[in-house]
């Protein structure tokens, strides 16, 4: 399980340090792709395979399903961690997430997210301000 918030910098070549606690879970390779809310999603190979099985069941006759799968897969990239504990994030993904210098890597249960510091701060401020309302709405999900 991924959890916690870690602040790192991304260098000019697009290399970002993966938190040590995450590296232990990720294995030899894992997948990073576009995420929602302007961040990137990272999955272990096992979690990616589970997600892939679900995505393959989406009906091709639904325009939104086709668009989502196309957008999600087209940016997916297999990553490997180098000897310094870094991954290289392709330019297209850096652009999607507005990754410049300061980044935040966040654990979110079965995946991790990579955010620009500015976007993360804006999201966290809004979520904190509305946390009670958000929590109240979670009752619909039996939490």
Curated annotation (Swiss-Prot):
One of its GO terms (biological process) is negative regulation of DNA-templated transcription initiation. Keywords: Cytoplasm, DNA-binding, Repeat, Transcription, Transcription regulation. GO terms for molecular function: DNA-binding transcription factor activity; transcription cis-regulatory region binding. Gene3D superfamilies: Transcriptional regulator MraZ domain (3.40.1550.20). It is found in: Cytoplasm, Nucleoid. Residues 5-47, 76-119 form the SpoVT-AbrB domain. Belongs to the MraZ family. This is Transcriptional regulator MraZ. It comes from Ligilactobacillus salivarius (strain UCC118).
């Amino acid at each position: 399980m991924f959890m916690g918030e870690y602040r790192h910098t991304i260098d000019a070549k697009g290399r970002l340090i993966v938190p040590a606690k995450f590296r232990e879970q990720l294995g030899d390779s894992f997948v990073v792709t576009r995420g929602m809310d302007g961040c990137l999603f990272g999955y272990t190979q096992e979690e990616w395979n589970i997600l892939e099985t679900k995505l393959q069941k989406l009906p091709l006759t639904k325009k939104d399903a086709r668009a989502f799968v196309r957008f999600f897969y087209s940016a997916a990239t297999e990553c490997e961690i180098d000897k310094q504990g870094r991954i290289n994030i392709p330019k297209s993904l850096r652009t999607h997430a507005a990754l410049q210098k300061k980044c935040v890597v966040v654990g979110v249960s079965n995946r991790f997210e990579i955010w620009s510091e500015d976007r993360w701060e804006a999201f966290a401020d809004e979520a904190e301000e509305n946390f009670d309302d958000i929590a109240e709405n979670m009752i619909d999900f039996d939490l």
